[in-house]
Amino acid sequence: MSSVILSGFADESAFSKKANEQFAALAAIGLQHYSIRFVDVGNGIKNVMVLEPSEIETLQKLHKEYGMSVSSIGSPIGKVKLLDVEDGTANKFIPFEKYLAEDVQIACDRAEAFDCKLLRGFSFYHPKGTSPEDHVDQVSDQLGQIAEACDKRGLTFGLEVEANLVGQTGDLLAAIAEKVNNPALVTIFDGANMVIQGLTSDQVYAQYEALKPSLGWLHIKDYKDPSLNGRVDHVDEESASHFVPADQGDSAHERIFEDLKTFLPTLADRMSRRGVEGIYLDLEPHVRGGGQFGGFSGPDGFGIAARGLCRVLDKVGIDYHLRTFEDLEAAKAQQA
């Protein structure tokens, strides 16, 4: 196998976040899969976690109309404080037992409602100014319980590498995954989320290597800021304005994809055992700007980012599928 499935965070593609605009933009680009995060189904912009049953039903109908399916739930699970201490941030603390019983179950409900097997999540905010390494044991315990909850419902929890969280590098995320030791927890590579912390291209590649034993899928965005000079301890919102397409940044995507091409059969076998047929490259471009709980690209920016990704895939020889006339003919036959 040397092919991947292209997907994307659809909310980045629409100025209004309206569902039909999101799906129209992605369908025009050629995508058939998307990750759901924020959406307006007629009652204002909402996170997927707080959608009403009627809104879910409307989205299910729109999926059929636009030929879209959900690759993952872009949940905010794990983007809360690990400890109930004041650290100068606005991050919330929720007692873990309550979080596991309520928020995690809602995320699982959404995955079942949208017939997908994957939940995206995070590794908790340690107190600002403390070392993330000191919190790996507690995070691993909590994420282990989240993985068990997902596994009971036939789902897989994907842990995204991101700044300011305990799992802010590939090495830390790999250590967490090793401690959890549950196939229901996999890791998500995101090169830009490490370049923004001051890692070089060579260092990002090393972080990708560290994640391979636990890797589940990849988020695709890139980052380039000539003013970066060494490691950044805490990333602020002002840093989120230097995202670029995958063929223009410092995340070593070409080198990573060269390796991924040979690793895909192993990775596909791993995810197939979890009921996931194929390896997703999930576009999350942020090319008009990013933030703590998402980013924005616009329909033009999303298309630019998608074409940038495809150029890198073409160069290294990894196959992918964009909508064809045959797909259109098949859709017409189904709607007849």
Task: State the predicted function of each range.
Residues 2-7, 15-32, 64, 170-336:
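Histidine-acidic metal/acid-base catalytic patches
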Residues 9-11, 25, 29-53, 74:
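N-terminal substrate-binding region of glycoside hydrolase catalytic domains
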Residues 9-13, 37-41, 75-78, 124-126, ...:
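Active-site beta-loop-alpha junctions enriched in small/polar residues
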Residues 20, 24-25, 65, 81-187, ...:
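Active-site acidic/histidine proton-transfer and metal-coordination neighborhood
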Residues 35-36, 70-75, 116-123, 155-160, ...:
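Short beta-strand segments at enzyme active-site cores
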Residues 40-53, 77-101, 123-135, 233-244, ...:
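Surface-exposed, active-site-proximal loop segments in enzymatic domains
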